[in-house]
A protein has these predicted regions:
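PLP-dependent amino-acid enzyme catalytic core
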Residues: 1-173
């Protein structure tokens, strides 16, 4: 976000979530609400209901009004939700696109990318890749994109192998 603010020619930042899509719902609806079911997924580092460091973005979204951020965080602690209002949600959507992918989507994405590009990705990167593809299909935006992938597919070997070779590939392991 800050690089974009300083002039890096970035059209959209894309927030990709797994089935615990609290951030997708927040960006699209303007309400951060943790009163929802929590799911354990194949992308466990994304298994969250309370996003760390979101308040840094909110600080910019709220014109650096720290008192407003403190109120929102207090509302989150006491009522498990807060709303940023239409104007701030529109600001968020002017900068960000958001989407989510469930475990099946991720497995399909791992297999697709492996088959088409001979690249083996982890489950977290599959979330990002799938959401980017969904964004491109719905928006028509074909801007060159960078996905920041920080996990090894071998750390999630069973899920990645199942995605590429099928359920029987891990039977008995």
């Amino acid at each position: 976000y800050y690089a974009r603010s300083m002039g890096l020619p970035v059209k959209k930042l894309i927030c990709a979530s797994n089935r615990n899509n609290v951030l997708t719902d927040f960006f699209l609806g303007g309400v951060y609400d943790t009163r929802r079911q929590f799911f354990k997924t194949t992308s466990p580092s994304m298994d969250i209901l309370i996003s760390s460091n979101l308040e840094r973005l909110l600080f910019e979204c709220a014109d650096r009004d720290g008192a407003l951020i403190a109120r929102w965080m207090q509302q989150l602690r006491t009522s498990q939700s807060y709303a940023v209002g239409q104007q701030r949600q529109e600001w968020l959507l002017s900068v960000f696109a958001a989407g989510y992918a469930d475990d099946r989507d991720c497995a399909e994405e791992i297999a697709r990318v492996f088959e088409q590009h001979h690249y083996l990705m982890d489950t977290h990167t599959a979330v990002a890749s799938r959401v980017l593809r969904q964004y491109r299909e719905t928006s028509g935006d074909s801007t060159p994109t960078v996905i920041v992938s920080t996990a090894s597919p071998y750390k999630f070997a069973a899920d990645v192998l199942t995605a590429v070779a099928g359920k029987n590939a891990v039977a008995g392991l």
